[in-house]
Amino acid sequence: MPLVVAVIFFSLWVFALGQLEQPEISISRPANKSAHISWKASIQGFSSKIIHWYWQKPNKGLEYLLHVFLTISAQDCSGGKTKKLEVSKNAHTSTSTLKIKFLEKEDEVVYHCACWIRH
């Protein structure tokens, strides 16, 4: 069974200082399985922040996927991939997780996560 590799790169785009923890830089999962991509941010007021997820295909710009505000996906702009993508947020652990279901070759991209903080 072929493996689908998801290359993960997280960006903490903030206008204030924050710290980002990445448990895995890249992951490999079998095709048609699921992958969970998580990041933890040490930023004040994480529970009230909107977390945005993007992907970047080779030689392309960033493409918006979806965002989460409280605990579940609030917006899905993934071009009909609603059943494929889920995002969650855990305010107690300051973690956001993107779940990609039914992995296929086109999912081998760089994933970005972002949070904007206003002063």
Curated annotation (Swiss-Prot):
GO terms for cellular component: T cell receptor complex. Residues 1-18 form the signal peptide. GO terms for biological process: adaptive immune response. Residues 23-119 form the Ig-like domain. Glycans are attached at N32. This is Probable non-functional T cell receptor gamma variable 11. The gene is TRGV11. InterPro entries: Ig-like_dom_sf, Ig-like_fold, TRG_var/const_region. PANTHER family: NON-FUNCTIONAL T CELL RECEPTOR GAMMA VARIABLE 10-RELATED, T-CELL RECEPTOR GAMMA CHAIN. Probable non-functional open reading frame (ORF) of V region of the variable domain of T cell receptor (TR) gamma chain. Non-functional ORF generally cannot participate in the synthesis of a productive T cell receptor (TR) chain due to altered V-(D)-J or switch recombination and/or splicing site (at mRNA level) and/or conserved amino acid change (protein level).
